[in-house]
Amino acid sequence: MDKRIERRAFLKGSALALGSVAVGDWGGARAAAATSEDKSQVFFTRDISGDGLLRIYSKINAGMTGKVAIKLHTGEPHGPNILPREMVKALQQHIPNSNLVETNTLYKAKRYTTADHRETLKTNGWDFCPVDIMDEDGAVMIPVKGGKHFQEISVGKHMLDYDSMVVLTHFKGHLMGGFGGSLKNIGIGCADGANGKKMVHAAPDDDNYASWLKGEPFMENMVESAKATIDHFGNRIVYINVLRNMSVDCDCAGVSAAPVKARDLGILASTDILAVDQASIDMVYKLPETELHDLQERIESRKGLRQLSYMKEMKMGNDQYELITV
């Protein structure tokens, strides 16, 4: 039987668990009163396995039709924290007419060129189905509706070949974004390596990463980029966050990722991108201080919570949700 809890009650429990951990400037902690009709549904399971993933996907898959892209961060070579291959394989084989999709990177590493990227895919075990590197044949511009930074954004050309998208995300920290949830997975991950990622990062034509855009302006760029993908798919896009092996570093870091200090929490899923990322943050912020500290420092020092508040401003979803355990 589904077990339901509204966000206000969840956050009350979170505050008790946090104790003395400071969250004073965390906008997400302000839960307004609302009726259940005002809330988005977020589904949760503690079962981080193929079975758990299939069970939670069944709660959100009503809009999935036609050719389905499974957007996954496939990681740098030998990354210790990437999602388990067998779990991802179980989902992909369950979804008809589906395959994994990725894009090349802006930074010069083992996923910078399509040839190197394909070798990395083999190294990391992503060989149980086709993996479409969406910018292999170039990019296209798609509109950003209501953006204040962009009117359009460059994405991998092959994205237009798909009818639906499942955003399957390893939720964790991120060097520049503070945290990497569903928003980051498509805001950066669907932008092509040659142009779109450069637009989001406001990166000059050099390898001086220190000069790339940071803080709230970067979060806003990332949100607007993601909005373009969401608007493109309409009601045929869903979001799954796996809260497992949550290093402060993204899977971009590969073997250099910082050690994991936080426990695994489970899988969250929704048809609402803001709700699923908000619920993920709320759940992480409920961790004991010893497990939360490094993640919280990474998130807040990078102004990562601006991802959530700007998604709300852009009317991309609801930060009030009903958490349903399945």
Describe these PLM feature segments:
Residues M1-L18:
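N-terminal secretory signal peptides and thylakoid transit peptides that target proteins
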Residues A22-G27:
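Hydrophobic membrane-targeting alpha-helices
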Residues G28-A33:
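Signal peptide processing junction and immediate N-terminal pro/mature segment
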Residues T35-V326:
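Extended, low-polarity segments enriched in aliphatic/aromatic residues
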